[in-house]
Amino acid sequence: MKLFSFEKSVGGVVFRKQGSELFFLLLQYRSYQWDFPKGHIEQGENEEQALRREIWEETKIKDIEVYPVFRSIVRYFYAAKKNEKAERIREGRGIYIFKKVAYYLVLTSQSKVELDFENKDYLWLNFEEAMKKLGNDDSRGVLKAAKNFIGS
């Protein structure tokens, strides 16, 4: 059994403008945690291709503009539990995961979201509300950096 895995993912700080206000998209995952759209980079994809695919799969938002000059990296480690652990063992993947997520800033004009099976809910929130709702400090740091970038 393989114990360790190193995995790369990509995520999007998806935002839209409404007048002079900015609204950021957060998804509620099955774990009940609120976060940005994100997912694995599949074989043969570059980061932008994976980002576009993940945003489409999770939200059905297709009209996006990716800002490649904004790239924020988050690294973390976790141990798979319960169903994920069993699935990883079956697939021969490590149960201790070193994860690297590259986040990009993504502008859209779409406000309608159609959720996939991975997500329970979504919200478009202003910066202050999004900072309160996000489920972890890493994501709050990414949002703060994105807001600073937009403001510059």
What are these language model-derived features?
Residues 102-107, 112-145:
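NUDIX/MutT-family hydrolases
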Residues 35, 98, 124:
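Short aromatic/basic micro-patch
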Residues 7-9, 31, 96-101:
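Short connector loops at helix/strand junctions that flank enzyme active sites
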Residues 21-64:
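Conserved Nudix-box catalytic region and its N-terminal flanking loop in Nudix hydrolases
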Residues 60-111:
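Active-site segment of metal-dependent pyrophosphate-handling enzymes
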Residues 2, 26, 95-96, 113-115:
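Short secondary-structure boundary/capping segments
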Residues 1-24:
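Conserved N-terminal beta-strand and adjoining loop/helix that marks the start
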Residues 14-16, 28-29, 107-108:
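Residue-level signal for short segments within beta-strands and strand-turn junctions
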